[in-house]
Amino acid sequence: MNSFKIKSYAKINLALNVTGKKSKLHNIESLISFIDLHDSITITESNTKQHKINFIGRFSKNISKINTISKLLKILDNKKLLNNKKFEIKVIKHIPQKAGMGGGSMNAASLLNFFIEKKLIKIKKNDSKKISNEIGSDVILGIKPSLAILLSNGDIKKFKNKIKFHILVAKPNFGCSTKYIYSKVDSFSKPQFNPPKQKLFEAKYLKNLDNDLEKVALNKYPELKRIKSYLNGLPNTLFVRMSGSGSSIVAYFHSKKACKKACSQYKRKFNNHWCIESKTI
């Protein structure tokens, strides 16, 4: 059987505003980019009666048997879209869990993209949106991933042009509970990103934006406050922002050299934290 290898890229929120709450869910708007940090997924058609999913790698511990990939496969089976074909999926996890980088969501999105591109399933654009939303709110962002603005009404505006930032991604040895962080949000921002324009991704604009979830996360976890303060104090840092609901903190640079130097300084200061250099793609 042929095996296919695909990359499942991490996403980061360059800015995030919580603009309100409707029933149990919060309305957010966000500036989103993908970065070259990725999980590696191998897909093999199988003769077995059940799909097999195997997570390996540094960040593969404690992933539930009911995960984004198993949910996707179950939906596709229930809709009889896979024509009774079964697959063995192996995921090497390089993206940390509970980091605000959508690792699990992007795994499901990457797999759905693969099935569509290889014509293993035939669905309309609207169906891929419905399937994505059944799995998780972030999944839709990974369907044909690109620079994007998520608007508070749920619409997504995508851009073909790329932005060029070198980034340091740091994460302490704990994750943040998305549910907890959102539950403590007690004030809302006015929408800022409508109409959506590419110029919002320029450093001069980004510097003055925020992630509304930082206030809650940094109060709950003083270590995140320490990380952000330290990164802000490094030379050539353009701005520093938490991604999603944390716990990853991202520092942005124009040059690879400055980013590399910052990363080595960070590792000396916080030697038990995870820290990598990456770039927007």
From Swiss-Prot:
Function noted in UniProt: Catalyzes the phosphorylation of the position 2 hydroxy group of 4-diphosphocytidyl-2C-methyl-D-erythritol.
Give me the segments passing through the membrane: none
Q: Name one GO biological process term.
A: isopentenyl diphosphate biosynthetic process, methylerythritol 4-phosphate pathway
InterPro entries assigned to the protein according to its UniProt record, in alphabetical order: GHMP_kinase_C_dom (IPR013750), GHMP_kinase_C_sf (IPR036554), GHMP_kinase_N_dom (IPR006204), IspE (IPR004424), Ribosomal_Su5_D2-typ_SF (IPR020568), Ribsml_uS5_D2-typ_fold_subgr (IPR014721)
This protein's pathway = Isoprenoid biosynthesis; isopentenyl diphosphate biosynthesis via DXP pathway; isopentenyl diphosphate from 1-deoxy-D-xylulose 5-phosphate: step 3/6
Q: Does the keyword ATP-binding apply?
A: yes
Q: Which E.C. number(s) belong to this protein?
A: 2.7.1.148
Record flagged with keyword Chloroplast: no
* Name the record gives this protein: 4-diphosphocytidyl-2-C-methyl-D-erythritol kinase
Active-site positions on this chain: K11, D138
- Which positions form S-S bridges? none
| Family (UniProt) | Belongs to the GHMP kinase family. IspE subfamily.
| Species the sequence originates in | Pelagibacter ubique (strain HTCC1062)
Which terms are listed as keywords in the entry? ATP-binding, Isoprene biosynthesis, Kinase, Nucleotide-binding, Transferase
Catalysed reaction equations from the record: 4-CDP-2-C-methyl-D-erythritol + ATP = 4-CDP-2-C-methyl-D-erythritol 2-phosphate + ADP + H(+)
**GO terms assigned for molecular function:** 4-(cytidine 5'-diphospho)-2-C-methyl-D-erythritol kinase activity; ATP binding
